[in-house]
Amino acid sequence: MTTPPIRQDLFGLSTVPFLTPPLKPFLDEDRQTCLDALSAFTHYRGFAALSGRPGCGKTALVHYFTQSLHPPSHKIMYLACGDFSGHDLLRAICCQLELEPVRSSSKTLAAIEQRLKDLGALTPILVLDEMQNASNASLELLRLLAASRFDSTRRLCMIMIGTDSFLGKLALAINESLRQRITYFHRLSPLDEAATATYLTHCLNQAGAHHQLIPPEAVKLIHDLSGGALRLINTLALAALAAASREQVPAVTLEHLHQVRTHVLLPKTQFTL
């Protein structure tokens, strides 16, 4: 029998932490504020833009939010935006609404509007992720979708998620009309050192830990190396636990982090193109 990379019995864990988001979300003041605002925003069916540096947990936070909604009263649609043409984006939205797209963008828009109207009291929530990749043509079609008043009633709730470069796109004059229709902006911040410690403890407790597995000096190094980005915090903590497990040590040390940092982070070297 092969030994698992992380021995749960060694650390007193019921599951392996940091592989997936914990069942109970980590909510510091910034993230709780965002969740509360999204709840109010969804009630009035508007457009929201959530931004932040890569790895700060934007998508996970919106996922927690949508999972908290009641399926009978909400229809959740999720799209990760690549370098779509405008019509490709409309086709993807049609698929989410179980519509057959047509060649004409104007007719496709009209069909989407009618389908949204037919949903009646059901609140459609369209989550558009990776919006920093969206073309100006795609943003223009979203503007057209937002511009329709559907008989003076807002029928679509849209949450757009992207890195800070997405805000740069919205700031362009060509996208001013769409920008003005966004009723809620929020930039998710990376964690400070204290929040990093709280986050690590939260994830470990959710995995069944009842004692300190990552001491303060290791927490500080994890924060310094990750810059407070949750994705990197997870990567470093998971790798450090695996290193401790290999040595059959029941807690992470600074040495474990120094062992793994060169393998899980981009090496600082001079690149030539």
Task: Label each PLM-derived region with a short phrase.
Residues L79-G82, L170, T183-T196:
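Conserved AAA+ ATPase "SRH/arginine-finger" region at the nucleotide-binding site
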Residues Y44-Y64:
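Walker A/P-loop nucleotide-binding motif
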Residues M1-Y44, T262, L266-L273:
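A short, basic N-terminal segment
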Residues T2-I6, G12-L13, S177, N205-L273:
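C-terminal alpha-helical "lid" subdomain
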Residues S14-F18, H74, F84-R103:
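Conserved NTP-binding/hydrolysis module of P-loop NTPases
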Residues T66, F166-R181:
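Short regulatory helix/loop adjacent to the ATP-binding pocket of P-loop NTPases
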Residues L188-P215:
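Conserved small helical "lid"/interfacial subdomain of P-loop NTPases
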Residues F47, G120-M160, L172-A173:
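Conserved Walker B catalytic segment
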